[in-house]
C-alpha cells in the first residue's frame, strides 16, 4: 500500500520526507511535476482507476492503474474528487470529461468552479477528504 505525492514548487523533497515519517506503514512515492499540484493533472477515483490529462501527467508513472483520459483542453477537470458510489465531483463546463466518466461507469456531479478557477483553485482545493485507512 502506498500514496503518490507530487514533488513540485509547492511540495518539495523535504516536505515529502517529513510526510513519510508520519506514514511509515505506507510507501510514499514522489512524482516530479511542473504543475502546482499533482492533482492538477490527475486524480484517483477508485479501484486503481484515475482520471488523467496525459499531456500533463504521464500515465506511465502509475503502472497497474486504469485511466479515464481527458483532453488537454479540459485538463482543469482532472482535479476531481471521488465521492463514493460511483459519483465524481467535477467542475462544470467540461462535457468531454463528463462523457468519458459516464462511459467508464461513473456519475459526474458538476459544480460551478468559475470563481475558484480564476485563482487556480480546483475541486480538491475546497475539501479535506478523509479516507478509511484501516
PLM regions and their residue ranges:
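Histidine/cysteine-enriched polar flanking segments
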Residues: 1-134
